[in-house]
Amino acid sequence: MSNPPAEQPAIRVTAMPADVNFYGDIFGGWPMSMMDLAASNVASRRSAGRAVTVAIDAVSFHLPVHVDDELSVYARVTSAGRSSMEIATEDWQRDRDSERTGKVTEASFTYIAIDELGKPRPVPPERTP
């Protein structure tokens, strides 16, 4: 199995019994919602303000998630336009009782930076650390 990205995850959560489907695996919408939360954090930070999801593209599911698995969600800006940003996300699970990991889900999100009236606003130039 491959390894997760080297950077810190945007969020890390534990899959709970309330998130299972009829077959006992975690419902597919749960890892997608975790990716949206992580992408939102990254988009808001990059745009220095409010940003909203306008599209989710190319969602791929690779492995099931089970109750008690730890889910690490990685997100990064891959491009920024005048008011839009593309955010690449990956979910990686780790078995609770081992260091075994696997890529669960990946997707690309499009966010728009908006102002206090909900209108598109420019994404500021990228800041250097």
Description of each model-found segment:
Residues 2-11, 66-67, 78-129:
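HotDog/MaoC-like acyl-thioester-processing domains
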Residues 56-64:
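Short, charge-patterned binding micro-sites
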Residues 1-55, 112-129:
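Hot-dog-fold acyl-thioester-processing enzymes
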